Amino acid sequence: MSLFDHSVSELHKKLNNKEISVTDLVEESYKRIADVEDNVKAFLTLDEENARAKAKELDAKIGAEDNGLLFGMPIGVKDNIVTNGLRTTCASKILANFDPIYDATVVQKLKAADTITIGKLNMDEFAMGSSNENSGFYATKNPWNLDYVPGGSSGGSAAAVAAGEVLFSLGSDTGGSIRQPAAYCGVVGLKPTYGRVSRYGLVAFASSLDQIGPITRTVEDNAYLLQAISGIDRMDATSANVEVGNYLAGLTGDVKGLRIAVPKEYLGEGVGEEARESVLAALKVLEGMGATWEEVSLPHSKYALATYYLLSSSEASANLSRFDGVRYGVRSDNVNNLLDLYKNTRSEGFGDEVKRRIMLGTFALSSGYYDAYYKKAQQVRTLIKNDFENVFANYDVIIGPTTPTPAFKVGEKVDDPMTMYANDILTIPVNLAGVPAISVPCGFGANNMPLGLQIIGKHFDEATIYRVAHAFEQATDYHTKKASL
């Protein structure tokens, strides 16, 4: 039995009782990485020397009264979150040798909580992708079956947790990039409310949509991690000055009287029968615990996919203009003048999907097309947000599938961008509305790959979706299933 089969609270108790050491936890992580990483390929960079040194330092503090619950816990960090002195590439060759000179706010907070960073996790390049096949280095595989994708863009973050390489990880979610891989890998992933967690130090893809969040084995562990990284940050102008409550207090298993909305659009055309049936089964479980549910409509959700790709690509075209070979990152050697420097550096450094989205965004923002595309997409985004607000006026949470289907095979959709984009059709509306949502395991498809239940909450009401997710988790055994890698 792995130490990582225990929860954070159980491991914390074992540490305080000196049944285990922090070094034991770190070595457990690196041993597992040595055993499975050649197949899973979840990590881009390991930080073994510093992690082991930090473990020895913390071993001397075991039993101290001020040790928090995350003391000594091993964590993986998605490679678009900057880490001081530890290579951060965004899985792009244009940043292949980039060593940041500061820590992201979330990394600072986790260091203050005495967690130990095991390494940086693989992803789709600049977080643009749904399968991890767009990494500029190598594709991560799904621990449940290495022939399948782990999802994206936080595929490495989800796969590392599912494979038992780390206890938990950080990912980022722009259109489903935490929740979709969490669903595909059978783990728990939360996208917080926009502004709940600081984005300072997150390499920007689409600044109005990006959000950092936790990926864990259980809902309780997820709540511990969000508790540690939440809160206002003066370094992030979009960080919200909203009180962070006690997320653990509501994990009672009680959902009696809870009002659940189920959008008909989330169970209709384009959603596979397996995903639909798993959600209906989950609703029966919650109904048996005293919750009620009704079908509702989010009428503008059918425009979410087009709206998202116009807005996110437009923001990406602006954000990624900084990677020009002048200030940092890889610089092309094939240069005769300044124009060559810009063109050749970006042509050689960016992958095909990143180039595709930059071109789409540049077109949408260009003179003559701005009003027809970007401005119109912003107007539709407002309508989508209003749809959520209208539903939340009468209901506590919204529930549906996280993804239309279980994970698909490696290479199955890589040459068909539109089919690939459609994998996020159920997660994208949440980012456009800025509300929080969590994915928890809720079953398996005919291919024996996990399915995820998506629970969506009101702005800054992560506590309620944790309450529902935890109640469902404890009433079922899906969270106890492990990839047999």
Curated annotation (Swiss-Prot):
The keyword Nucleotide-binding applies. Signal peptide: none annotated. The active site is at residues 78, 153, 177. It comes from the Bacteria. GO terms for molecular function: ATP binding; glutaminyl-tRNA synthase (glutamine-hydrolyzing) activity. Its EC number is 6.3.5.7. Keywords: ATP-binding, Ligase, Nucleotide-binding, Protein biosynthesis. One of its GO terms (cellular component) is glutamyl-tRNA(Gln) amidotransferase complex. The keyword Protein biosynthesis applies. GO terms for biological process: translation. Allows the formation of correctly charged Gln-tRNA(Gln) through the transamidation of misacylated Glu-tRNA(Gln) in organisms which lack glutaminyl-tRNA synthetase. The reaction takes place in the presence of glutamine and ATP through an activated gamma-phospho-Glu-tRNA(Gln). HAMAP family: GatA (MF_00120). Belongs to the amidase family. GatA subfamily. NCBIfam families: gatA. This is Glutamyl-tRNA(Gln) amidotransferase subunit A. It comes from Bacillus cereus (strain ATCC 14579 / DSM 31 / CCUG 7414 / JCM 2152 / NBRC 15305 / NCIMB 9373 / NCTC 2599 / NRRL B-3711).
